[in-house]
Each structure stands twice: as structure tokens, then as C-alpha cells.
Amino acid sequence: MKLSIGNDHAGPDYKKAIVDYLLSQGHEPINHGTDTADSVDYPDFVHPVAKDVSNGTAAFGIIICGSGNGAAMSANKHPNVRAALCWVKEIAVLARAHNNANIISIPARYTSAPQAVAMVRAFISTPFEGGRHQRRVAKISDCCTAQF
């Protein structure tokens, strides 16, 4: 499976750990992140990931910044993207199962690299439950066409 990954200066070590895990499982990571701790702007690395997910180039996206908030906000500006800020594995599972999230946003300053790998593993292996959640997820996109 192809997965797109991007990170700012807070996440190079996290990205390396995640990419190593993905490769060990036979996945194809698409790297849009920085490899240094030199200060950069997270949207420059998040938008390419969101585009990959939005247009179907990647099945899932992984974005990493200090708090995870700015990355998630940037990604969620793209059509068909549902980026979820996750800080523990259980939240990653619920983001997939109940919200059909397709991008996981990881807060590097509030998690560890091993936790991030565990969250990614849980995120990409959890199916969307559909059912009552499908109706709710559909309403997320409805705002893009609705007149309020």
C-alpha cells in the first residue's frame, strides 16, 4: 500500500521510525518530509501529503509536526481529506473506525517515536465501521456544498 508522509523540523526521527516500519511491512512510503531539525514551515510538507490522499495517489497520509494541530488544520483544507490529530493508539483506532480518517496527524512534542509507530500501525490496519458512522462522515463533506 502507498502511504504519503510529511513532517516539519519536529518530526525527522519520527518519520524515520515510521518509514522503517512501513518498509518492513512491504508498504510504499512517499516521502514529503524534511530530514533535518532546521526550522521549516509545516504547510510546505503537509499539502503534498494531503494532495496525495485527496487524488488517490496514496491510501493514507501521515503528517507530523510539534503539536499536530497545524498539520491537521492544513490537511483538512483539501477535498476528501479527513485528518485526525492522534496522540494515543486508541484515538487512532477510533479516528479510522468511526470517522474514516485518511490522514493521521502526530504531535511529535507530545508522543514518542515508538508511540507514533504504534499509532500508525493501528491507524492503517483499522477498517471503517460504516453503518451509522457513514451518515455522520457524509455530513462532514455536506458543508462544502450546503448553504448555511
Predicted regions and their residues:
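Helix-adjacent hinge/juxtasegments
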Residues: 48-85
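Glycine-rich phosphate/diphosphate-binding loop of Rossmann-like nucleotide-binding domains
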Residues: 5-24
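Structural motif
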Residues: 38-47
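C-terminal binding/interaction regions
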Residues: 4-6, 10, 89-148
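A general structural signal for well-ordered alpha-helical segments in protein cores
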Residues: 15, 46, 71-72, 116, ...
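A short beta-strand-loop structural module common to alpha/beta enzyme folds
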Residues: 28-39
